[in-house]
Amino acid sequence: SSLNGKADGNLKTAIFKLVRNFTQVSSYSALPQYFQKTDVYPNSSRWWDMYSDIVLYAPSFKGLNREHSFPKSWWGGSTTVPAYVDLNHLYPSEMAANTAKSNYPLGMVDRSYNANFQNGISTVGYPVSGQGGGAKYVFEPDDEFKGDFARTYFYMASAYQDLTWKYTYMVSQNLWPTLNSWSVDLLLK
C-alpha cells in the first residue's frame, strides 16, 4: 500500500492523496439516511450518540442534529467544500448537547468551576490551564469516545490538509504535527 513505511508528515500526506477521490454523501439533508447504516447500535434501533446519554431511536431523527465533530466554522463555514458532507466526521447528536458544544475545541474542563453544560457524556466549561488553544470554553467528551474523536480529528487533519483553517484552537496549518500537543494528550486519555 502507499502508506507502508510512512510516518508523521509523510504518512499524513499519503493519506491526503489516498482519500482525495472519495465518494461524497449526496446531500446534507440525506445524512440521517446514511446515519442509519453508520450510527445505530447493532441489534437495536438506538442511535449511537457520542454527545449524550439520552436514548433516541432510529429511524426517527426527531431531537437530533447533524453534528460536524470538526466544526465547520474552523474552515470558514463553507458548505461547498467536501468536508461539509464528509460522513467521517458527521455524527447524530442530541440537540441540547450539540448546541452546548458549539464550535468549541476539545479540551479538559477545569472542574474547579461550575460547568456550563454537563449531561453525563459531554461537558462544556472553562479549560484547564494549557488547553483550549486560547478558546474561552472547551468541550470535553466522555473517555469512552475520546478514541473515536482522535480517529476523526486525525482523518480530518489529513484528508483536508489543503484547507486553510480559520480557527486553529486544536490544529495548525503546519504539515506536521497538525494537532496541538495538548489536544493529542486529551485524545489519548
Q: Can you say where each PLM-predicted feature lies in the sequence?
A:
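Domain-level detector of nuclease and nuclease-like folds
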Residues: 57-189
